[in-house]
Amino acid sequence: MSFTVAIVGRPNVGKSTLFNRLVGKKLALVDDTPGVTRDRRPGDARLMGLTFTIIDTAGLEEADEESLQGRMRAQTEAAIDEADLSLFVVDAKNGLTPVDTALAEMLRRRGKPVVLVANKSEARGSDSGFYDAYTLGLGEPTPISAEHGQGMIDLRDAIVAAIGKDRAYAKEDVAVTDVDIPPSESEADGEDEEPVYDDTKPLRVAIVGRPNAGKSTLINRFLGEDRLLTGPEAGITRDSISVEWDWRGRTIKMFDTAGMRRKARVTEKLEKLSVADALRAIRFAETVVIVFDATIPFEKQDLQIVDLVLREGRAAVLAFNKWDMIEDRQAVLADLREKTDRLLPQARGIRAVPISGQTGWGLDKLMQSIIDTDRVWNKRISTARLNRWLETQQIQHPPPAVSGRRIKLKYMTQVKARPPAFMISCTRSDALPESYTRYLINGLRADFDMPSVPIRIHFRSAENPYESKKKRT
């Protein structure tokens, strides 16, 4: 993008609504409750021929530096410093407050271009608030309605005037990127060579877990900066915030998510929106890191989150955080491994890494586990290898007999990856017990080195081409 714009203002003036309008989708949570946005959220904006990076920010308030509101303010000030231009949003419907005046003074001291935006100008009685905005000394306010999309052309013109026409419409060099070409039919059948894992493609990783497990602290440690709001208060993160960084030459896009509590405890509308946002991040990700608090691991909600991730078909890695607070580490690690195998039988072999987001201990090992797990998630196995394996499995443990006739597994092929899914042609597929499916899945994990990912097997009854002729005679 050619330039960066920060949306700033006091709480509940419509900043996130404007952000969603400019990016063309509902990325930021919107609610009547003040202070919904806490972290700074970037997005790709398009406005009447302009393309730029837009940053949604927390509502600015006067607050002590160490308080939650003070730390939110620091995040917003960092966004202002990062941006080339600020959109200072005021509420034309409800008028100015002393906080607006203080923020205008702060923006003037920064010395960067500012566009004054009078939102909610469609409301009855908004004229008074619009004209009051002139008193802020930031030039002519631009009247808009972020909710209804009114005034967007005027906003575009104000941005161009503030940043300059050359900068606003500057052309960027377009990087040549790899195109993901689907395999041909012969490649999909796997008769030729199995495809090589591409470790240069960007990787999408969601960080999930219970509230206060240390998810945001972990991402900040990866980035080497206080990019995300953290603190002792549970439930600080509300939006799913994405950040990009480079790990050993590979682009990693990480999604910080709101803490996920048991459904019965989620009563507030805003928390329900936050959890729904976290679920969307899981579905968009390729690999999901489930962060456990190592001091109180394996709460019921931890297990439910792991089960949810696997049911969504994502690759999963466990991170036992706060390892710096553990004293007898060897004994605790052995106990965690035993509980992982016992309490998560559906995730046999899942990678589990002890880490400390506070000190950075174990993060390289965690990242390598993420890469290794993604490699398995993308794995394809040739049809020839699968059918040799299937024959061996039936010799070692034959399928059960039904009405005196043994079920025969005739043919196996991989129908997709991400996650790996297989189709087996057999007789009497409806009579094959679930226990035999588990036997095959466990065999695939062990023989083809496929831990940490869900494996799906679909059975199809083999058709007898002479069956219809027999019925006619």
From Swiss-Prot:
Coiled coil: none
Molecular function per GO: GTP binding
UniProt keyword GTP-binding, yes or no: yes
SUPFAM superfamilies found in the cross-reference section: P-loop containing nucleoside triphosphate hydrolases
GO biological process terms on file: ribosome biogenesis
Record keywords, A-Z: GTP-binding, Nucleotide-binding, Repeat, Ribosome biogenesis
Domain EngA-type G residue range list: 3-167, 203-378
Entry binding sites for GTP 1: 9-16, 56-60, 119-122
Binding positions (GTP 2): 209-216, 256-260, 321-324
Domain KH-like: 379-463
HAMAP family named in the record: GTPase_Der
Quaternary structure, from the entry: Associates with the 50S ribosomal subunit.
Family: Belongs to the TRAFAC class TrmE-Era-EngA-EngB-Septin-like GTPase superfamily. EngA (Der) GTPase family.
Purpose: GTPase that plays an essential role in the late steps of ribosome biogenesis.
Name the record gives this protein: GTPase Der
Organism annotation: Rhizobium etli (strain CIAT 652)
